[in-house]
């Protein structure tokens, strides 16, 4: 197996970000439309995340970014990734994302509707962050540390494994030509 290196994996992450850009647009639009959007988007957002990061990985061996960069995710022994392993790979980011989303939904609902609607998107975001429960900052910090640690870990091991690969017993390899 030829392991996918840092830049190929970073490129896949960037392609996935681009693929999810329409969802970012929906979030911006919805956030500007009503303060209820954050709460209403929790379940659909979670389901889309699971579909993208678990279902597509099991079905095709990777996310669109991984596939576009000529890589695939397999078990450590080279066999196809299992559903359980795909979920374990995504579980930490999923949990942290759900907690931050729930905190922002809670804070949005604490803001009076007329005040919320009088603000621009950036002002709404800043106000929701300021009004979030006290644990939000710790969870948000943990999520940032997790994401950066993923990339740093790839740099310092021969198999180019990220933390989630160690948890799930997976590795990202280059597809055979």
Stretch-by-stretch model annotation:
Residues 1-177:
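Membrane-interfacial and juxtamembrane segments of integral membrane proteins
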